[in-house]
Structures are given as C-alpha cells and as structure tokens.
A protein has these predicted regions:
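Extended, Lys/Arg-rich, non-catalytic nucleic-acid recognition/anchoring regions
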Residues: 1-205, 211-213
C-alpha cells in the first residue's frame, strides 16, 4: 500500500511538472494529452470523452462492474449509453456508434486502440423490403481486440439495435449464394470444415447485423 501511495505521489509530481511546461505554450497543445485514470470505469470515460461529448458514465459503469462480470457489463453500459445519447441528442447513428465504442472499451480494459480506430463507421441501411438494419464497418485495428471481443462487438450492436427499435438484417438470395461460394474458396486451416449449407445456416442467415471491412 505504501508503495502504491508513493507511485501515485510521484506520478502527480510528474504531471505537475508537465502542466507547468505545457502552460508555456511551446508545444502544439497546452493540455497534457494523457489523462490520469484510477480504474477501468475512469479509463473508459477518459478514452472516449471525444465521443461521449460530456456524457458521464464513470460512476454508472463502476457500479455495474461491481455487480456483474466484464462481458455482461460491456453490454449493459453500451445499451445504456446509446439510449441516453439518443434521448439527449436525437442522433440514432451517433448514439449507436458511441455505445459500441464504450462496450468495446470495457471488453478491452480501455487500454487498446480498438475502441478508437477499430470501428470505422456505423450505418443504418435498408433491406430490400425497405426495413432498416444495422451495419458496422470494422478497420484493421479491431484485430488488437482479439476474436472474442470482435464477436462480442457484433453482439453488443445487436442488443443496441433491439433496444432502439432497428430491424434485423435480411440477406437476399444472391448474398446467401455468394457466401456459400466464398466459404468454400477461402476456408483455410480450419480444424473443422462444415459444408456451405451448414455454415450459412449457422452464421449468415441468423446474423441480425452486418459487419463490413
């Protein structure tokens, strides 16, 4: 405990020195770019403050984390943030985007670049019948999150779109046939290679959102 207190004290001294140096105006910014954070809830809010636009989530997330596991907490806080942002600003796409990033940040301990640069865009598109569905565009840095977090991100998107009343993705016949063809062409190094029909029935046809990129 005394060692932790010493670390906190010395870190604060370093920040005090940095503030004095920044105040001279010789750098590009007069503020310290790396904010201090004490736990996951604090890190998440500070990491995504540009997307949250003043929405406070630290205390709420901390309480959720005390009562549930991190995976469940990521879904709960993502849905909560999306609903609050949509209620406050009225921008559905932006609310979903922010909720997704918050959920992904919780999954990755808010120490990776994935919540910032791994999600390229969130779009609300239309099925052939005119109904809406959610599309998530992923970028290269999402790989830093790992496979489980990437899959969870799609699940979080599905939970958010349900809460906000967005319909599910309905693939066309041509899209299904394309997946069946490409699955056979690109499957490499799998321990189990299901036939195209099985692969489609368990993934593409039951996927309520689309992931691009």
């Amino acid at each position: 405990e005394s060692y932790q207190l010493w670390l906190d004290s010395k870190t604060q001294e370093a920040y005090d020195i940095a503030e004095i140096a920044k105040a001279k105006g010789l750098d590009f910014s007069t503020e310290i770019e790396i904010p201090r954070a004490s736990d996951l809830a604090s890190r998440t809010e500070k990491l995504l403050e540009e997307y949250l636009k003043g929405l406070e989530i630290e205390e709420g997330l901390r309480e959720i984390l005390l009562n549930t596991d991190r995976e469940s907490a990521s879904i709960q806080i993502a849905v909560d943030v999306a609903k609050r942002m949509y209620s406050r600003d009225g921008d559905l796409r932006e609310a979903i985007d922010c909720g997704l990033r918050v959920g992904l940040a919780v999954l990755t301990e808010a120490v990776l670049v994935a919540p910032l640069d791994g999600i390229g865009a969130v779009r609300i598109l239309n099925n052939s019948d005119g109904s809406e569905f959610l599309s998530i565009d992923f970028c290269g840095p999402i790989r830093a999150a790992g496979g489980t977090a990437q899959a969870m991100c799609v699940l979080i998107g599905d939970m958010i779109r349900r809460e906000l009343g967005i319909g599910r993705y309905t693939p066309s016949t041509s899209e299904v046939e394309r997946v069946k063809e490409e699955f056979g062409l690109y499957r490499v190094g799998l321990q189990y290679k299901p036939p195209p029909e099985e692969a489609v029935s368990y993934t593409h046809l039951t996927l309520p959102t689309t992931g691009d990129g």
